[in-house]
């Protein structure tokens, strides 16, 4: 060691080429070692969400940022920590037109967090809420922060119409719906997400009656879950104030009660008239809502004397051809399982976001997983799909629904051919 120390101290000119190379390699190894610290364990200490409102329904008077504030405040209160402990926040939000600058900043300050709290808004289309959790986890793992808030928010009821800037043409102007333009259209093939779902249904030979049956099952499961109190630990009430009228308190999801099973098989297909399979009943709906989780390192949980609900085990992103987005979660989920050395049989519960019934059926088919373990309390088809929120909602739901020691895997597709997946373990 004394010889090595002398070599490192000696001048470069006094060394032979061989010695110079040896010194460089020693310093490289030294540098590589110190740049790879042990990652910190990340735990979930609370997970809350607002009820999900129907399009132009019970929550339509509240912007996404207000819904986000309510979810964030609820999560911090459930965690039982001072707001000053939250060092940073990430929130998913897709349809930001007309919301004003920095939506996450609005949500965080609206929740009463300190002015000094850094905020970032994430847009990965429907995977935004989950990606926010993933990015917060990375920051916690590497020790950059020790307590964070992450989640997602969306108010599809408040998304504006737009027109192109420029001189007004003869004959009038054309307004475009930003829900469709920025949220539900495959920009590469210039088709609606539902047309992409039809393409996958054809490729995998998934018939309409299978999708209808799945949708009915989703509504049935959601109703049973609400009646059994399965959502009680995650949903916080929202008070809606209307000038000159009594306040309205929204306590439960609105969408799952708005179904007539007798009409499901009779509905016309939406995106493909001949031999189509996707209908308004077996697809998710347009909705409003927000979800938030308080994440922290295991060390921070000990310092703050809070009991973690679950730990984040692994996560991954994947991407396929844009038109094939419904099957992208298959690859993200497979990557997660491979990374941690688990088998699909080791997963007690799966949450596969129900953008369309087709998406879940395709993932069940390709992964060869037990349908009885998938979306056991319903999903986006029956509960609703506020697109920036859903990725956070399904992670939060697993956090409460799993039993101690069980693994749960949440996955969600996103426009452009992407997907995200996250594995958690109940503590």
From Swiss-Prot:
Stored InterPro entries: Thiolase (IPR002155), Thiolase-like (IPR016039), Thiolase_acyl_enz_int_AS (IPR020615), Thiolase_AS (IPR020610), Thiolase_C (IPR020617), Thiolase_CS (IPR020613), Thiolase_N (IPR020616)
Binding site for CoA: 219, 258-260, 263, 284
Pfam families found in the cross-reference section: Thiolase_C (PF02803), Thiolase_N (PF00108)
Positions annotated as active site in the UniProt record: 126 (acyl-thioester intermediate), 413 (proton donor/acceptor)
Catalysis performed (reactions): 2 acetyl-CoA = acetoacetyl-CoA + CoA; propanoyl-CoA + acetyl-CoA = 2-methyl-3-oxobutanoyl-CoA + CoA
Transit peptide extent on chain: 1-33
Modified residues (N6-succinyllysine): 66, 78, 174, 181, 190, 202, 223, 230, 243, 263, 266, 268
Superkingdom of source: Eukaryota
Name of this protein: Acetyl-CoA acetyltransferase, mitochondrial
């Amino acid at each position: 060691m004394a010889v090595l120390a002398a070599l490192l101290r000696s001048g470069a000119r006094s060394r032979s080429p061989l010695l110079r190379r040896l010194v460089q390699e020693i310093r490289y190894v030294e540098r590589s070692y110190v740049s790879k610290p042990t990652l910190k364990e990340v735990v979930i200490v609370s997970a809350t969400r607002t009820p999900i409102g129907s399009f132009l329904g019970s929550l339509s008077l509240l912007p996404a940022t207000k819904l986000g504030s309510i979810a964030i405040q609820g999560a911090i209160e459930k965690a039982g920590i001072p707001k000053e402990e939250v060092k940073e926040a990430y929130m998913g939000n897709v349809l930001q037109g007309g919301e004003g600058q920095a939506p996450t900043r609005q949500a965080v300050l609206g929740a009463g967090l300190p002015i000094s709290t850094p905020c970032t808004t994430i847009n990965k289309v429907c995977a935004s809420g989950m990606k926010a959790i993933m990015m917060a986890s990375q920051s916690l793992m590497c020790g950059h922060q020790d307590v964070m808030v992450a989640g997602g928010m969306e108010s599809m009821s408040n998304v504006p119409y737009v027109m192109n800037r420029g001189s007004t043409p003869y004959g009038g102007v054309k307004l475009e719906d930003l829900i469709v333009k920025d949220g539900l259209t495959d920009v590469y093939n210039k088709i609606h997400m539902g047309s992409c779902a039809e393409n996958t249904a054809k490729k995998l030979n998934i018939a309409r009656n299978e999708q209808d049956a799945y949708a009915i099952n989703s509504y049935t499961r959601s109703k049973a879950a609400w009646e059994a109190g399965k959502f009680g630990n995650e949903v916080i009430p929202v008070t809606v104030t209307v000038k000159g009228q009594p306040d309205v308190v929204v306590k439960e999801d609105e969408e799952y009660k708005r179904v007539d099973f007798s009409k499901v098989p009779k509905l016309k297909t939406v995106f493909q008239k001949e031999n189509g399979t996707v209908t308004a009943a077996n697809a998710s709906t347009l909705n409003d809502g927000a979800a938030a989780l308080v994440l922290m390192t295991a060390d921070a949980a000990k310092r703050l004397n809070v009991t973690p609900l679950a730990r984040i085990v692994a996560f991954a992103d994947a991407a396929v051809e844009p038109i094939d987005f419904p099957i992208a979660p298959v690859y993200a989920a497979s990557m997660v399982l491979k990374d941690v050395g688990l088998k699909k049989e080791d997963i007690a519960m799966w949450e596969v976001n129900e953008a369309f019934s087709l998406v879940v059926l395709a993932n069940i088919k390709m992964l060869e997983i037990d349908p009885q373990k998938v979306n056991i309390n319903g999903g986006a088809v029956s509960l609703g799909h506020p697109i920036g929120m859903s990725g956070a909602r399904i992670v939060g739901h697993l956090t409460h629904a799993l039993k101690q020691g069980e693994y749960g895997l949440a996955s969600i597709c996103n426009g452009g051919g992407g997907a995200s997946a996250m594995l958690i373990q109940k503590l």
